[in-house]
Amino acid sequence: MPNAIVAAEQYREIFLNQHPIMDVRAPIEFTRGAFPNSTNLPLMLDSEREKVGTCYKQSGQQAAIALGHSLVNGPIKQQRIEAWTSYVKANPNAYLYCFRGGLRSQLTQQWLKEAGVEVPYIQGGYKAMRQYLIGVIEAAPIQQPLLSLSGMTGCGKTDFLLQRKEAVDLEGIANHRGSSFGKNIDPQPTQINFENQLAIALLQHQTSGVACLLLEDESFLIGRSALPQTFYNAMQAANVLVLEESDDARLERLRNEYVHKMYSGFCERLGPEAGFAAFSDYLLQSLVSIRKRLGGKQHQELQDLMQQALDQQINQNDTSLHLVWINLLLHKYYDPMYLYQLDKKSERVLFKGSHQAMHEWLDSYQTR
């Protein structure tokens, strides 16, 4: 029976259906970049892979293969086969891959076959699948018209996007809310993983049958996640929708996001005392990150107000003073910057309105 190979034509189906994949690359390769539906069960550990790589450079392929067999042998080999078979037992429809769909994939498949387990390996491996996803991102602006959702900080763009089937949530994929205070408790994905997850989200969106692709009007960087250049350029040329919200609602939303949610998250992760310390550091360091743009005097004023709010919060369990520095930050920093940016794209604005009005406009857009 010939070895079972999953052809490149099936990449789309693998990603859309979140097909379970056994990634037999070394842990260091997996950490740099992987797919959401993959599990790292390496043929060789990092140190073993490094030795084999050095041997390959010095003595050629056959010597490297022989060294690999000597390093992964006996009980070590048996442990790896047992880990693979356990995964396949839990995921009977699993596929496997290595970096290029070469020797590591073939050897893993052979050892599994000898253990009585048949697992297809993916043609081209991780590298070819990654290239496929890069192509998905580059082609996305051609597949559907783009609409860019803009609006002042705190107007609820993310909340709005999460209610729309036309939307892909870039900030959710980047695990960052896009502003200077947009850091979340959990770290952002690696750049490669951000791109992989973005491509899969775009693939899923393209099967949803909607008339457009709705994205938040983002900077090139979302935290430290960089939008692919071609995709970002298309976003910069897209027509714009402007979401409007009252100042009071914006203040309350930002207090909830910057203060209540972050404080609760840190305390849940670290406990009350360490949680409050980490929360305070998050706020103060976020302010430091925009010190140059604020200017020293304005930064000091905001820092003093922020510290007063933190003191009131810890001593009186009252977060009302946070509204003072948030209000100043909006009107002295975020709003002027937003209005300047909006003025440059005013000719591309299709519609401005409240959450309800925007929902109605988009509903009618779908039927045009």
From Swiss-Prot:
Family, per entry: Belongs to the SelU family.
Gene responsible for this protein: selU
Active site: C98 (s-selanylcysteine intermediate)
A GO molecular-function annotation: tRNA 2-selenouridine synthase activity
InterPro entries (alphabetical): Rhodanese-like_dom, Rhodanese-like_dom_sf, SelU
Job description of the protein: Involved in the post-transcriptional modification of the uridine at the wobble position (U34) of tRNA(Lys), tRNA(Glu) and tRNA(Gln). Catalyzes the conversion of 2-thiouridine (S2U-RNA) to 2-selenouridine (Se2U-RNA). Acts in a two-step process involving geranylation of 2-thiouridine (S2U) to S-geranyl-2-thiouridine (geS2U) and subsequent selenation of the latter derivative to 2-selenouridine (Se2U) in the tRNA chain.
Record carries keyword Transferase: yes
Keywords noted in UniProt: Selenium, Transferase
Any coiled-coil regions, as ranges: none
Superkingdom in the source lineage: Bacteria
Protein's name in the database: tRNA 2-selenouridine synthase
The protein's Enzyme Commission number: 2.9.1.3
Keyword field contains Transferase: yes
Occurrences of domain Rhodanese (ranges): 15-138
GO biological process: tRNA wobble uridine modification
Pfam families per UniProt: Rhodanese
Annotated catalysed reactions: 5-methylaminomethyl-2-thiouridine(34) in tRNA + selenophosphate + (2E)-geranyl diphosphate + H2O + H(+) = 5-methylaminomethyl-2-selenouridine(34) in tRNA + (2E)-thiogeraniol + phosphate + diphosphate; 5-methylaminomethyl-2-thiouridine(34) in tRNA + (2E)-geranyl diphosphate = 5-methylaminomethyl-S-(2E)-geranyl-thiouridine(34) in tRNA + diphosphate; 5-methylaminomethyl-S-(2E)-geranyl-thiouridine(34) in tRNA + selenophosphate + H(+) = 5-methylaminomethyl-2-(Se-phospho)selenouridine(34) in tRNA + (2E)-thiogeraniol; 5-methylaminomethyl-2-(Se-phospho)selenouridine(34) in tRNA + H2O = 5-methylaminomethyl-2-selenouridine(34) in tRNA + phosphate
Organism: Shewanella baltica (strain OS185)
Subunit structure: Monomer.
Database matches in SMART domains: RHOD
